[in-house]
A protein has these predicted regions:
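Catalytic cores of alpha/beta
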Residues: 1-8, 60-70, 115, 119-133
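Glycine/small-residue-rich loop that forms an oxyanion/phosphate-binding "nest" at active or ligand-binding sites
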Residues: 1-35
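Structural preference for beta-strand elements that scaffold enzyme active sites
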Residues: 13-15, 50-56, 73-76, 110-114, ...
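Glycine-rich phosphate-binding active-site loops on the catalytic face of alpha/beta enzymes
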Residues: 16-23, 74-86, 132-151
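Histidine/lysine/aspartate-rich catalytic loop segments that bind and position anionic ligands
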Residues: 21, 52-105
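C-terminal helical cap(s) of enzyme catalytic domains, especially alpha/beta-barrels
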Residues: 28, 87-92, 144-167
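Alpha-helix-loop-beta-strand connector modules within alpha/beta enzyme cores
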Residues: 32-54, 91-115, 158-166
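Aromatic/hydrophobic pocket-lining residues that form the small-molecule binding cavity
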Residues: 35, 39, 60, 95, ...
Length: 167
C-alpha cells in the first residue's frame, strides 16, 4: 500500500489525505476527533524515516491542534471551498479570513503550512497575498493550463505567482 511506497521511495515529504479507495479527488480534510491510531502509526513510521509529514486539513483550529498532537510536521489546507467560492466576494472574504486564522494558528504551534486543491492562476495570487504558507500544491490546473499554453510557460507563470509571495 501507500506506506510501502513511502518506505521504498523515501520522499522528503508525504501528505496524508483522508480519501477512500474509490474516491476520485479530495473533498475534505481529516476529521481527527475520533480514534486515529492507524494514522498515528503511519505518521510515526514516516517520522522514523526522516520524512516530513503533512496532514490534509480543513481550516479548523481544533483539528489543526489535533494534527500537531498526532505528530504532523505540517498541515496542507484544503482550499477547495476557497476556489469554489472565489467569484463570490462575500464568501471569498470569509474563506480568506478562515484560512488566514488557521494558518496563523498552525504557525503559532510550530506547524508548517501548505495549501492545495483547485488552486489556479486566477485564484492563487489572491490566496497567497492573504495567507501565510510554506508551499502550495498545484496539480490539475497546471496540467490543464499546460495543454493550451505549454508546460514551460505554465510552470513559469505559476513560479512567478509564487515567487512574488515567497521571495
Amino acid at each position: 500500500g501507500f506506506m510501502n511506497l513511502i518506505k521504498e521511495l523515501k520522499p522528503e515529504q508525504c501528505t496524508f489525505v483522508p480519501d477512500d479507495n474509490h474516491q476520485i479527488t479530495s473533498d475534505h480534510g481529516w476529521d481527527l476527533s475520533s480514534n486515529n491510531n492507524d494514522l498515528k502509526d503511519c505518521i510515526n513510521s514516516a517520522n522514523k524515516l526522516n520524512i516530513r509529514v503533512s496532514l490534509f486539513m480543513d481550516p479548523d483550529k481544533r483539528q489543526i491542534q489535533k494534527a500537531k498532537e498526532l505528530g504532523a510536521d505540517r498541515i496542507e489546507l484544503f482550499t477547495g471551498p476557497y476556489a469554489e467560492n472565489f467569484l463570490n466576494n462575500d464568501s471569498k472574504r470569509l474563506n480568506l479570513l478562515k484560512y488566514s486564522e488557521a494558518s496563523l494558528f498552525a504557525k503559532s504551534i510550530d506547524l508548517g503550512v501548505n495549501a492545495g486543491h483547485d488552486l489556479d492562476q486566477i485564484n492563487l495570487r489572491e490566496f497567497l497575498n492573504n495567507i501565510t504558507v510554506d508551499e502550495v500544491s498545484i496539480g490539475q490546473a497546471l496540467i490543464s493550463d499546460a495543454l493550451t499554453d505549454g508546460l514551460d510557460k505554465t510552470v513559469k507563470n505559476y513560479l512567478a505567482i509564487c515567487q512574488n509571495k515567497f521571495s
